């Protein structure tokens, strides 16, 4: 259910991420931080849950099976809340349309990878349904007066799946591994934190000292998944990292070393992944929670419809066709929920590759596309975009001119720039077997033909698209990408997509590479005062819009089909955190 969700989105994004210069002073406890954060809102929410809200805490396609870790006994739950493993004795089954390319917590970035990681591993903090950061493996934290040193208290009742206790040394090791491997989201903290400045003060206290003020630091920690140091080193192979070998990379390709609610049970990269409940999870378990979770890669809509109607799936992916959702609405034992999000569907335009390196060409593309048909016919229920940031963010710039369908203007822009009909040929890439994206590509091709631009459609697997993104030359001219906050802060939208340091990923397929954009992002990150930071964000959005850096097609209202007896789903405004299966139950 989504009653009042639009207002909640707006309320909780009211002022963007917070470092909170006033509240983070003089002892600055986590509780004071959260009180202020709750007013200003680190990120937004569209709540959708048929059962209780979650506790604690974009898209198709080498090879090996994986085994999971063994659970050993430990305390039942956190603060006496849990029942230590009350079991529904059942399996939760879901489909995804994109393979799990990696399950190494130092490497994962996309939605399926994060879905797997947040269920096998824990972070220090967790984004709740309102986008606020709440304690997770860290039971509490404080921030120094100069906003540079963050001190975390690690829970004393948490254990890894190996049975080893979670300690401050594991957190320190995780950061070292994260930076040394230097993949995944390591760039988020590049220049902000040096691994040498993470110190295990004692068994349950870890201290991070930043190189500079970094307002979204706490929010980025939802992507730092803590690994079992002993398990990783015990299973390390020879490698480039001295006495740490390969840092357990080969092992963690097919195994887990986490403390999360589920252990890896089996893994077939191309087709499926399954998890088994860690009975001794420190939070305990809701009544009628699932013993096992199975996620199958199924891209064919007729197959999904059949499996749901036969009670062989409990939940669909968010990427099914409109026809599938309409059919499921009329299927006995199935409900379909439409969930407002803060995810934008972008047509990412390669700003560095001719002919789309020409701003005039990008402007023509932007005004030559039929956004209303895209929203109303291809993605019904979606909301109008206005610039790179979803309007539900409180720091959204409502003065941006959002292009509308105006083929006459598009043709005139091209003529003024010296282009004649037939001069321009571009490539458009989208995720193959994704019905919505295929229809969007066909609409784009048709629209561009009307303004004299020839579009070659090249559907690809998601894995291939992510590989193409690593090179400006190989990245196609236009690319379909869903992108929403991967951590609860507006910074995630700007840095990951537009900063030059974050280049050559699927998130940054526009290859903006603009010094002024870089400077504005860095200034916002270093600004503690939320009002001053909001002004920077407004200017940043305006510049990206003026550059026609990419096409902002719509804000997603995603849909899922559910079995009627499944509850506990809660949307959280950080990538894949609504797939935290700990809270899912059989009602």
Positions of predicted regions on the chain:
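N-terminal secretory signal peptides
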Residues: 1-28
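Short, solvent-exposed loop/beta-turn-alpha elements that line the ligand-binding surface or hinge
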Residues: 11, 18, 113-145, 224-259, ...
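Aromatic- and charge-enriched surface segment that lines or borders ligand/interaction sites
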Residues: 139-184, 207, 355
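Ligand/substrate-recognition segments at binding pockets and active sites
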Residues: 269, 288, 300, 415-485, ...
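Ligand-site clamp/hinge motif
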Residues: 278-327, 454
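Append "and occasionally in soluble cytosolic enzymes with long acidic Gly/Pro-rich linkers
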Residues: 356-446, 450, 513-519, 539, ...
């Amino acid at each position: 259910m989504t009653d009042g969700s639009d207002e909640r989105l707006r309320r909780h994004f009211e002022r963007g991420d917070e470092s909170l210069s006033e509240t983070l002073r003089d002892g600055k406890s986590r509780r004071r931080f959260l009180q202020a954060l709750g007013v200003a809102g680190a990120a937004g929410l569209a709540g959708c849950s048929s059962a209780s809200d979650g506790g604690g805490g974009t898209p198709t396609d080498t090879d090996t099976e994986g085994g999971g870790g063994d659970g050993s006994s430990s305390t039942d739950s956190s603060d006496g809340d849990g029942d230590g493993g009350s079991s529904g004795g059942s399996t939760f089954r879901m489909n995804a349309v994109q393979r799990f390319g990696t399950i190494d917590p130092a490497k994962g970035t996309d939605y399926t990878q994060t879905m797997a990681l947040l269920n096998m591993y824990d972070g220090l903090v967790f984004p709740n349904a309102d986008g606020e950061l709440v304690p997770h493996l860290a039971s509490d934290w404080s921030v120094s007066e100069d906003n540079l040193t963050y001190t975390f208290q690690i829970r004393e009742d948490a254990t890894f799946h190996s049975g080893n206790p979670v300690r401050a040394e594991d957190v320190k090791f995780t950061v070292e591994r994260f930076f040394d491997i230097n993949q995944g989201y390591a760039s988020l903290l590049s220049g902000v934190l040096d691994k040498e400045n993470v110190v295990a003060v004692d068994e349950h206290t870890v201290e991070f000292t930043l190189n500079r003020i970094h307002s979204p630091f706490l929010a980025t920690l939802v992507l730092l998944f803590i690994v079992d140091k002993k398990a990783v080193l015990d299973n390390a192979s020879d490698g480039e990292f001295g006495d740490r070998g390969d840092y357990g990379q080969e092992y963690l390709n097919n195994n887990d070393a986490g403390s999360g609610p589920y252990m890896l049970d089996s893994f077939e990269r191309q087709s499926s992944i399954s998890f088994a409940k860690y009975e001794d999870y420190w939070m305990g378990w809701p009544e009628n929670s699932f013993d096992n979770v199975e996620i199958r890669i199924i891209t064919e809509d007729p197959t999904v419809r059949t499996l749901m109607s036969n009670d062989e799936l409990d939940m669909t992916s968010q990427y099914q066709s409109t026809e599938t959702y309409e059919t499921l609405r009329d299927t006995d034992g199935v409900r379909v929920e439409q969930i407002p999000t803060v995810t934008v569907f972008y047509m990412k335009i390669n700003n560095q590759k001719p002919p789309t390196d020409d701003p005039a060409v990008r402007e023509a593309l932007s005004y030559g596309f039929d956004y209303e048909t895209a929203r109303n016919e291809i993605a019904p229920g979606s909301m109008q975009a206005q610039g790179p940031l979803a309007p539900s963010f409180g720091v959204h710039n409502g003065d941006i001119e959002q292009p509308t369908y105006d083929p006459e203007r598009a043709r005139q822009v091209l003529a003024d720039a010296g282009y004649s009909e037939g001069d321009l040929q571009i490539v458009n890439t989208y995720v193959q077997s994704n019905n919505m994206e295929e229809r969007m590509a066909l609409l784009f091709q048709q629209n561009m033909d009307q303004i004299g631009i020839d579009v070659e459609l090249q559907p690809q697997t998601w894995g291939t698209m992510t590989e193409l993104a690593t090179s400006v030359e190989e990245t196609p001219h236009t690319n379909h990408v869903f992108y929403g906050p991967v951590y609860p802060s507006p910074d995630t939208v700007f840095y990951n997509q537009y900063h030059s340091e974050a280049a050559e990923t699927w998130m940054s397929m526009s290859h903006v590479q603009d010094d002024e954009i870089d400077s504005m992002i860095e200034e916002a990150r270093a600004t503690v005062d939320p009002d001053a930071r909001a002004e920077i964000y407004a200017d940043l959005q305006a510049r990206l819009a003026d550059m026609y850096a990419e096409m902002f097609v719509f804000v997603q209202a995603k849909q899922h089909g559910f079995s009627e007896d499944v509850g506990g789903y809660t949307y959280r405004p950080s990538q894949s955190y609504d797939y935290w299966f700990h809270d899912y139950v059989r009602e």
